[in-house]
């Protein structure tokens, strides 16, 4: 009888805890991100402000004013110029190239290695456009591994309703958005 009572108490406690922490707040890494079918690369080109990102090694020195500038190269690759402000107040930048991986240009591989080293295998990161609004003003970018995620906007600020909508899309794709860091944009 005591064993039955203990089992009931434990089961009830687990049920109560599960109600306090709904499953929707946790990342489901079994859910695979899906890139949009296609993007108009000419409309996508230009300056984007980072609104939020998942922490990563490559951005460890960036504390504010992170932007990405995309340009179309003659060979149909995409020029990438990422810039940010460091803790010391210095602007730093990194130049790279993105290589389209599908006909719709929504899946790319990006390399920031010097041009002579970009041929080295396994040195390019995934850049998938997971969502973009029809006017190309807001975009959600990630990849299949759930390691990288960015919310980008054409303006330095994004209204909360739009931010929450893109956050929900990221959750639906299995990203742990509790780790997302909002980017300070002072320019």
Regions found by a protein language model. Give the residues of each.
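A beta-rich soluble binding module of mature secreted/lumenal proteins
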Residues: 3-6, 10, 21-187
């Amino acid at each position: 009888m005591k064993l039955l009572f203990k089992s009931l108490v434990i089961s009830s406690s687990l049920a109560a805890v599960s109600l306090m922490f709904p499953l929707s707040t946790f990342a489901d890494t079994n859910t695979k991100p899906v890139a949009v079918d296609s993007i108009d690369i000419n409309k996508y080109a230009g300056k984007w402000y980072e609104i939020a990102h998942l922490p990563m090694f490559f951005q460890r020195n960036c504390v504010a004013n992170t932007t990405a500038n995309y340009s179309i190269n003659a060979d149909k690759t995409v020029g990438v110029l990422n810039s940010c402000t460091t803790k010391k107040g210095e602007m730093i930048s990194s130049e790279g190239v993105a290589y389209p991986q599908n006909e719709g240009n929504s899946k790319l591989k990006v390399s920031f290695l010097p041009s002579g080293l970009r041929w080295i295998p396994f040195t390019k990161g995934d850049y998938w456009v997971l969502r973009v609004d029809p006017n190309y003003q807001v975009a959600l970018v990630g990849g299949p591994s759930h390691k990288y995620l960015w919310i980008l906007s054409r303006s330095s600020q994004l209204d909360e309703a739009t931010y929450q909508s893109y956050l929900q899309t990221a959750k639906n794709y299995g990203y742990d958005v509790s780790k997302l860091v909002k980017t300070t944009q002072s320019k």
